[in-house]
Amino acid sequence: MAESKNIAIDASPDKLISKTYLSRAVEPFETAALEALLTSCRHNNGQEQVTGALLYHGGYFMQLIEGFDEAVERTYARIVSDSRHEIVSVLFEDHISARFFPDWSMGFRTSEGADAASIEAIYETASRSAARFPINDFLLLFSNDGD
């Protein structure tokens, strides 16, 4: 499921932002529902030139989206209004000089593809530190992308 779609990017580095959020699914997502969600995300993100990665574990989503400021904000507004999840909390947002996932319209991992303890540690660290989110830890979850 870690399929991605290359996106043509015409970006000025000073206009790029990255936003990472955590949310809770209203109901657990089965494989078919996750695949449908990813298909929709990849289509919408391709239209907006938004790239990123999504983790799903134990009924929780953690997603990093990146792109032009306005496109990321439109995408995030769409995410917040989605009734399939609740308690959407921004963990980190910042201007970036380059994308972390330039070729992924939406990378994906479930708890089978990521260490659950790592996900929990990231969330705990982010909760304690409002100033800085450990983005490198999040990115390491995708370092063994063999899909």
Where on the chain are the PLM-derived regions?
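Charge-rich, low-complexity N-terminal segments
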Residues: A2-D147
